[in-house]
Amino acid sequence: MNTGEAAPLLDVADLRTHYGRIQALHGVSLSVPQGSLVALVGANGAGKTTLLRTISGVHRASSGTISFDGRDITRASADLRVRSGISQVPEGRQVFGPMSVEDNLMLGAYTRPLAEAQRSIERIYAMFPVLEARRVQPAGTLSGGQQQMLSIGRALMAQPRLLLLDEPSMGLAPQLVAEIFTAIVALAREGITILLVEQNAHAALSVADFGYVLEIGQTVMFGRGRDLLADERVKQAYLGM
């Protein structure tokens, strides 16, 4: 499924994933064009997180294909996918609490030479100054919003071409949600391709070039972000309108 004129950096075709005997994805297909921000919205249990984890290699696909930059990575290891340019910001942030902010960031650069990691960390500090101010502080003592910034920064340390964001606004106050989405838009403007999973459908579709709606492990709607925002079915099901 092609979302536009730009060639897809990520192409998922008829993807199926199981947890034991339980099927979580039922033939999902989607494309993420190079340089775009694509939002994936849907209710809890729709399969959004499972899809991201299957793309990143945390979960194994039962069938279907995942192509990245024209290469089939369906059976590639998670480590190889990171080295190829895919980074994921997991749901719930998952920072290493006892470790310092800077050590958490450096963990994200394990595939990069030290000199590149040092340049990357300065870029992260410029993007999120609060992290630099707390660079020696244990990550577990940060606020929820600061931990989300740290989680995003850690993923960026790998210098990804594709950033997978899983529920970045979860549990955050409205002001912090706005800050996180401002950062996401800035990353997209820098040319990083983003696949954003978000239950806050209005926030996600407002910034997305394209969007998909996932229901019970299947993609059921696709369109430009602004068009999905105006769609009556999306309004009723996900926007509370």
Which role fits each region the language model picked out?
Residues 2-241:
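Glycine-rich phosphate-binding loops of nucleotide-dependent enzymes
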